Structures are given as C-alpha cells and as structure tokens.
Amino acid sequence: MSATTRTPATPGTPGTPGSLAMEVARVQNSALAEFKKPTAMVRHKNKPKILTEEKYIEEMSKIIQRDFFPDLERLRAQNDYLDAESRRDFVQMAEIRERYSLGRISGTGRSTSRRNNAMSPATFETPVSQAKCSNTPLPNSRATDTPFSTDGSEKSDAEGRDTTAKLSLDAFLQKYTSEDNQSFQEIIETAEAKLRQKYAVLYNHEKLSAEQLQRALMLPSIETQFEEPDPLRKIETWNYTNMNSIMYVPDGVEYTEEERVQLAERKQSIQHNATRLPDEAKHREMDTKKLNDEVPQNGAGGATATPKVRGFDLLRSPSPRPGEAFSPIMTWGEIDGTPFRLDGGDTPLRPTQGPSFRINENSRRENIAIALAERVSERMRNQKQMALDTARRNIGSPLIRTNMERLASMSPAAQLLATGKLGIRGTPRLRHTPSPMSGRKRKVTPGVVRSTNTPILGEPKPKQQAKISTPAKNVTIDTGSTLTDDLLKIPTKRRTAADFF
C-alpha cells in the first residue's frame, strides 16, 4: 500500500480556498477605504425663465390689471365714449354701446339687452364673448376672485393663459425674468466673484478654519495614532468669521425648530379686496336694510316703538310745534360782517398753550430788499431788451450806417478807444479852410468831382488831390491837407527794440 504525499497549496495559487479568502479580504479593505459619509441632498435652485423685455412687461401688466385694477377696461371704455361724444362721433358711440352694453351672461340677474340704458357710459361693463365668457371678470364677482385676462386673438389668448392665467404676481416674478434683469444679475455675480478674488485672504481663511476644526474632530487611523501629533489638529474654542462681533453688528439668536416651523407656515399673500374700493350700490343697500331693521326697535330720541294693534301702528298725538326737535334747513337774520381775508398779524392765536403754526409778516428790511431787487431786475431787463433791439436792427438793416451810428453802437470801452486813442470824434468833423497866404486860388468849375463822404475806419485815406476835368482844359488843382490825414495808417507790425536804433 503506497502512501501519496500531498503538497500544501500556496496562497498565490489561483483557485485555492486561501487565495479566494485573501481576494475577498482585499476587496473588503478597498471598499472600507473608499467609504464616504453620505452628504445631504442638494436642492437645485430653479432658474427663472428668461423672457424678452416686451413680453415680460406685457404679461406683468396683464396680471396687475387683472388682480389690482379690474375696472380699468370699463374706465377706458367710458373715456372713449366721452371723447366720441365731445367730437359728436355717433358711429364710434354706437360701436361702443354695442360692444359694452349688449353682451351679458345669463344667470346674473341682468337682461341681455339693455338698449334703453345704453346711452349712459356708467353702465359699461367688460365686453363678454361666448368663447371667453369664463375668463372675463364678472361685475358681481367677489373681490377675492381672480379673473383671467383676455386677448384679442386665439393664439395670444392661449399663450397668455399658459403664462399668466394661474399665476399671481409673486409667482410670476419667481418663475420668469426679463433679459435686462438677468444681465444685471450676472453683473452682480461677476462683481462679487471679483471682490472675493481680490480679498481672497479674508474669505478663504474662514473656509480653512472650518476645515481645520473638522480635521481636529476626526479620529485618526490606527497607523497614525502612534506618530507625531499633527500641529494643525488643535481645537479652537472660537470660530473664525470675517464679520466679527467687534467690528460689525452681531448676529441675532438662531431660530428654534418651533419658530422655523411657524415661519414656514406663514406664507405671504395679498388680499386683493383691500386694494380697491367697495361697490357703493351694495353698501347703500346694506345700509338701507340695516336702517330699516333698526327703526322699529328704536324710535326718535331712543324711545321704544309703539305697539301694534291688528298689524297697525298707533299714531302719536301731533305736536303744536312740529319742527322744534330738528335743526332748521334755512334761517334768517342779519350778517354781522362781510367776510375778508385774514392777514398774518390778524390770525387768531390758539387758546391752548401747545405749539401752533403761524406765518410771520415780512420785515421792513426784507420788503425794501425785495423792492430794490425788483427795480434792478427791471432795469437789467430794459437794458437787455434795448441791446437786443439794437443788435437786431444792425443785423437786419441793409443800409450803410454813419460814423455816429457806428460809434453809438459800440461798447463804452470801444467808444473810449475810438475817441481817445484813434482820435475819432463823435461830432461831424470841421474841415479847415486854407488861409489866403497858402498858395494859389482854387478855381471851382462845374466839372469838379469831389467825394464828401467820410472814409470808413480801417481804410487808408488817399491824398487830397482831385483832378478837375473840364470840357475845354485838364487842370489839376491842389485842395490842400486836413488834420485827419494819415490818421488811420496804423502799423500792422509791432515795432521791436531794434527799430529805434
């Protein structure tokens, strides 16, 4: 009988029980190493839907008109009717009456045809059609009911109902936004990100402090427990915050669980019946009914009502003076004085010692100052008007002005310069006649042509020599010189120091 020797199986041999056990242990260790703490469910904030600016304003206007101004359509119809009546546009008046006065809903207690009362714009209601009768605000509906908006075409009506039919104003603003609002929000987020990046030392340190505290609270593994302690694993009693309580206003106490539940239950809402005035007709009916209910119980002066016999009230004995208990509607007498306006000093003082409002009269100094200011302003207005008239006359006149007119139109400084420096006189210049001892006699003939006009400023005056032409002879006569010769020959170039040496 031969004995067989069995060799022990090595753990590395595949398919053996030992290798399978080691493989299972390795998988468990890897799974344990990769184990992570489950995080809380992250709630993704729903981004609002972006609408165009025109669509956003249009839909929001529909909601505001529907919830807060349901009578706006009727008021517009009344204004159109009154405008057509003032223009005597009978065609438009008939169209408005047909649109707003004939359509009525059955079951509301009103007739479907009110031709007799159609002339009054006060009876206008919102037009009702058979296709949209369910979406039109009813005149007798309660104030808390939310009517639906109406559009002209079926397509726009369907889009309007899809967007704003079942949404309030707050819900619409949370669900939709405009392009401008979205762009502004992106600008704000970009600016905040740049601010955090610029002051990263302040913002990141708060995050690092929270991570360090979490790391200190964690239990180290078995392998690292006998190593040197981590210097960062130190528990700090104070949490680091950027907005500390010393430099900023401290935060309040956190809400308890009960307070959080109460805040969650309290939802913000708008009472639409408080945003509009109640119907006066209903209030009148209620007041009349209430008054009728109270009259049998309380008579005049608080006395009890008279008893009834077989359904008839007992009458009181007539009073010799029937109007004694009532204040008269009209009276007679003499007027003590004619009413007049009370000035500031005549205002009666209040009998109480409390503060009272009183306008003081202007002082004498203030009245004088006001009078002087008015006088100066009137003078300035007159001067300004005269200057404007002169400038307008000078610009618009095609005539050539004389030296006197030109000198009068100048400013005082220009007049002083013209008379003092340039030698221009305001009066007509006197031409000096030549003396008998000065040369030859002048022969005056009918053929002499001489210019008597004064030369214009800025033009050089030619020499005073005139050629006398006669049919018989050509004789040249010297007319002499005057005091104004070469007066206006002002050098155009300013002299320098070298010109005098």
Swiss-Prot record:
Residues recorded as bearing Phosphoserine in the entry: S409, S411
Task: Give one Pfam hit by family name.
Answer: Es2
Q: Which UniProt keywords apply?
A: Nucleus, Phosphoprotein
Cellular component, GO, one term: catalytic step 2 spliceosome
Where would you say this protein principally sits, based on its record?
nucleus
Q: Where is this region: Disordered?
A: 1-20, 105-163, 425-471
Q: Where is the composition biased (Polar residues)?
A: 126-151
Positions with biased composition (Basic and acidic residues): 152-163
Compositionally biased tracts (Low complexity): 1-18, 105-115
Tell me the compartments it is located in. Answer: Nucleus
Q: Name one GO biological process term.
A: mRNA splicing, via spliceosome
The similarity annotation says:
Belongs to the ESS2 family.
Q: What is this protein called?
A: Splicing factor ESS-2 homolog
